[in-house]
């Protein structure tokens, strides 16, 4: 290496060391938000003068109070203007309004999302004086007794509050004042946020808690020079609470949690290189973050499900997704209402698998397309007549007859045939590979009372008896048992795998070879029992309570299974669905309601100016990161100023990471996707766009001419965003009259704002 290169390297290295030392010594700010954001205000003063006279400082303090109020007022207007002109159930209000009704009726239901957002919908109904008696049928007119406007206003407040949070986030990052205003304007005048914010949906709640999580995360980062101080603990705990609320609305909250987790790992890894830090302090950093960023969010998540279970105390549409004992304790449930002991022949039962996510043993007339080509046997998560079975005597003995008067109770260790009530087929297995789990045997419906073989015979093995009833009998709900094939020696089991489309994506049932004894996939219980010949259940009989944590895990697994089943149907065209690449490019939008001339119409589409610009900014910032890495490898040190480095991290790098975490999963996932899935990722793209303005135009503030040009660019782009929002405002505020009146908004053939035949 030449002497000049060597000298350059040593200077750059010294500058890098100096930068690290400066970063360690950098102080954060005081407890109030306005004071904690003062570093951004100090940076703003450079736009005007190197000196900071008292009058200018007063103006900045006044700005930090007045502008958030103005921006919030504008946000309330853009989210709530004409919010009630469409008195029909719009888009997914049909789902989430109905779920809110279930909370007011206390009826148990099942959905793919965690409960916090839907409980807030229920709260909005309660505050609006609604009694929960309506089920929000899609497209129907709201009844007079339901104040849907108040419910929508409640939801819109979450969307509106994202705007002041964006303002404070920009200040916390350290953006200059023009950039703070720009970022706030980008969020304020975003058509997609304004459109979805006015309906009874979860998206605005999800966005609010996501924005709150990132804001509190940045504020916590700004306290890094004062670890374990009151402000440090405050923002750590607020971050944890915000993360817990985000994931409690939708599982998409895992993405922002992952971003904070990556930051935390990098932070702790950096501390490990600090020889001045004692091991005790280092371990305390670990413990504090485990508590604040793992335990606190998990407790929030857990608490939401506890409230969910406590509120939904009555039987409802989602009962079958839960364990049998859980269902039995729901008010009005028919589970466990039958006689206590199971009898041969006369007892018609449904049989529930006890694995996490277990379903009811089921069969139907459709046959396997391969293998034996016999009748399918599956597990099904919903109540159905095809879930009903009865026990008959083993093959070779006389079949049970309705003329028999003596009651013969089922006993463990005895061999029986299990007969499907509606088709008369015997539960059967044979040495044929199962359709999905090829190492296990297929289970089918085969034969009848005449046709069959010894592979129809199954032995009941009791594994657990809850209660003090006769241990030698099979009891409804409280007896856990295994079902062993006498001939093959394998056990009836639900694998957890879903069958293909020919099996209606129901759960696979197999005969499992050599399972371990505690494998709950082979454990079953009687869920419902009908038998008029037996005495009813004693009135004073009480089922044992279920374990909350087990119910919590069971429900979450059922939610994941339902979510994974939301895959596109190749035989059907879903005109509402879209691909991830179409979102940042605005290739498509989404009609949110019927397109008749008589009703106001809404079209979900981002503000073109900001969405396209943010997409370009993401690509530009990616290229910038690559260039900086190449220069760093060649011993060049950029971003020497600690303030610039901090803005780069909080305003560019971590928003890019958050954007990727919120966007890329939808690129690779197999489930059906829609335009609104991009809304959280769009927020981080807007932050990156603001950073590109801030960093790209920073040097222009050094001269008077540069400051003028900088002002023109900021003002011009903000005017473009506002103008674009207003131009497309009908898609957010409601398009009244024929859609042909708005065909001027159809910039591209893929936008179906106006009907194609009218365009």
Curated annotation (Swiss-Prot):
PROSITE patterns linked: MIR
GO MF annotation list: dolichyl-phosphate-mannose-protein mannosyltransferase activity
GO biological process terms, semicolon-separated: ERAD pathway; fungal-type cell wall biogenesis; protein exit from endoplasmic reticulum; protein O-linked glycosylation; protein O-linked mannosylation; regulation of endoplasmic reticulum unfolded protein response
Keyword Ligase annotated: no
Modified positions (Phosphoserine) in chain numbering: 32, 38-39
Catalyzed reactions per annotation: a di-trans,poly-cis-dolichyl beta-D-mannosyl phosphate + L-seryl-[protein] = 3-O-(alpha-D-mannosyl)-L-seryl-[protein] + a di-trans,poly-cis-dolichyl phosphate + H(+); a di-trans,poly-cis-dolichyl beta-D-mannosyl phosphate + L-threonyl-[protein] = 3-O-(alpha-D-mannosyl)-L-threonyl-[protein] + a di-trans,poly-cis-dolichyl phosphate + H(+)
SMART domains: MIR
Compositionally biased intervals (Basic and acidic residues): 17-27, 40-50
Lumenal side: 86-167, 220-251, 311-609, 669-676, 732-759
Domain (MIR) ranges: 339-394, 407-463, 471-529
Iron keyword on record: no
Disruption phenotype: Leads to diminished in vitro and in vivo O-mannosylation activity.
Subunit and interaction comment: PMT1 and PMT2 form a functional heterodimer. The complex interacts with endoplasmic reticulum proteins EMP24, ERV25, ERP1, ERP2, CDC48, HRD1, USA1, YOS9, ERO1, PDI1, UBR1, Cue4, DFM1 and TED1. Forms also a minor complex with PMT5.
Role this protein plays: Protein O-mannosyltransferase involved in O-glycosylation which is essential for cell wall rigidity. Forms a heterodimeric complex with PMT2 and more rarely with PMT5 to transfer mannose from Dol-P-mannose to Ser or Thr residues on proteins. The PMT1-PMT2 complex participates in oxidative protein folding, ER-associated protein degradation (ERAD), as well as ER export.
Similarity section: Belongs to the glycosyltransferase 39 family.
Name of the protein this chain belongs to: Dolichyl-phosphate-mannose--protein mannosyltransferase 2
Native source species: Saccharomyces cerevisiae (strain ATCC 204508 / S288c) (Baker's yeast)
């Amino acid at each position: 290496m030449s002497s000049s290169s060597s000298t350059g390297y040593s200077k750059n290295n010294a500058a890098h060391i100096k930068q690290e030392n400066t970063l360690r010594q950098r102080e954060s700010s005081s407890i109030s938000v306005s004071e904690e954001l003062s570093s951004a205000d100090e940076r703003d003063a450079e736009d005007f003068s190197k000196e900071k006279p008292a009058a200018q400082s007063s103006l900045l303090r006044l700005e930090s109070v007045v502008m958030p109020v103005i921006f919030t007022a504008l946000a309330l207007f853009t989210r709530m203007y004409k919010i009630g002109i469409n008195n029909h159930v719009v888009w997914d209000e049909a789902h989430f309004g109905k779920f809110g009704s279930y909370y007011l009726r206390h009826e148990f239901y099942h959905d793919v999302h965690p409960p916090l957002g839907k409980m807030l919908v229920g709260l909005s109904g309660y505050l609006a004086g609604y009694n929960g008696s309506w089920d929000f049928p899609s497209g129907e007119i709201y009844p007079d007794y339901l104040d849907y406007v108040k419910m929508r206003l409640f939801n819109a407040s979450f969307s509106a509050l994202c705007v002041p949070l964006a303002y404070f986030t920009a200040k916390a990052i350290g953006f200059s004042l023009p950039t703070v205003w720009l970022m706030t304007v980008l969020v304020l005048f975003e058509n997609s946020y304004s459109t979805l914010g006015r309906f009874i949906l979860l998206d605005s709640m999800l966005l609010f808690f996501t924005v709150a999580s990132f804001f509190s995360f940045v504020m916590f980062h700004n306290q890094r020079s004062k670890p374990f101080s009151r402000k440090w603990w405050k923002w750590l705990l607020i971050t944890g609470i915000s993360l817990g609320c985000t994931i409690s609305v939708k599982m998409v909250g895992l993405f922002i949690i992952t971003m904070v987790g990556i930051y935390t790992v990098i932070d702790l890894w950096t501390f490990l290189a600090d020889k001045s830090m004692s091991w005790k302090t280092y371990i305390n950093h670990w413990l504090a973050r485990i508590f604040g960023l793992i335990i606190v969010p998990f407790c929030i998540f857990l608490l939401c499900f506890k409230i969910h279970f406590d509120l939904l105390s009555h039987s409802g549409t989602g009962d079958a997704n839960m364990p049998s004992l859980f269902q039995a304790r729901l008010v009005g449930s028919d589970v466990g209402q039958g006689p206590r002991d199971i009898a041969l022949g006369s007892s018609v039962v449904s049989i529930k698998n006890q694995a996490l996510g277990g379903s009811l043993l089921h069969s139907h007339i459709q046959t396997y397309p391969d293998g034996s080509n016999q009748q399918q046997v599956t597990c099904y998560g919903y109540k159905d007549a095809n879930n009903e079975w009865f026990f008959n005597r083993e093959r070779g003995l006389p079949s049970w007859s309705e003329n028999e008067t003596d009651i013969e109770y089922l006993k463990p260790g005895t061999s029986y045939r299990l007969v499907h009530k509606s088709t008369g087929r015997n539960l059967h297995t044979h040495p044929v590979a199962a359709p999905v789990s090829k190492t296990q045997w297929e289970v089918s419906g085969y034969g009848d009372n005449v046709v069959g073989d010894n592979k129809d015979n199954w032995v009941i093995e009791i594994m657990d008896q809850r209660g003090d009833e006769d241990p030698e009998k099979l009891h409804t709900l409280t007896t856990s048992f295994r079902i062993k094939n006498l001939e093959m020696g394998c056990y009836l089991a639900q694998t957890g795998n879903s069958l293909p489309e020919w099996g209606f994506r129901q759960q696979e049932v197999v005969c499992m070879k050599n399972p371990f004894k505690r494998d709950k996939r082979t454990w079953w219980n009687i869920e419902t029992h009908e038998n008029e010949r037996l005495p009813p259940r004693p009135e004073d009989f009480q089922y044992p309570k279920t374990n909350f944590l087990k119910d919590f895990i069971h429900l979450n697994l059922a939610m994941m299974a339902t979510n994974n089943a939301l895959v596109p149907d190749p035989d059907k065209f879903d005109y509402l669905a879209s691909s991830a690449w179409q979102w940042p490019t605005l290739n498509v939008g989404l009609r949110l309601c019927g397109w008749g001339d008589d009703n106001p119409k809404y079209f979900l589409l981002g503000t073109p100016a900001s969405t396209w610009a943010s997409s370009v900014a993401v690509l530009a910032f990616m290229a910038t990161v690559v260039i900086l890495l190449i220069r760093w490898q060649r011993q060049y040190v950029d971003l020497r100023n600690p303030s610039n480095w901090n803005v780069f991290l909080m305003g560019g790098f971590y928003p890019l990471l958050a954007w990727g975490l919120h966007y890329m999963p939808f690129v690779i996932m197999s489930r059906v996707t829609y335009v609104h899935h991009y809304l959280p990722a769009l927020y981080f793209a807007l932050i990156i766009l603001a950073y590109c303005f801030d960093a790209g135009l920073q040097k222009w503030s050094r001269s008077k001419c540069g400051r003028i040009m900088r002002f023109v660019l900021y003002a011009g782009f903000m005017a473009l965003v506002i103008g674009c929002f207003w131009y497309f405002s009908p898609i957010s505020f409601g398009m009244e009259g024929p859609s042909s009146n708005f065909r001027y908004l159809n910039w591209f053939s893929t936008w179906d704002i106006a009907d194609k035949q009218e365009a």
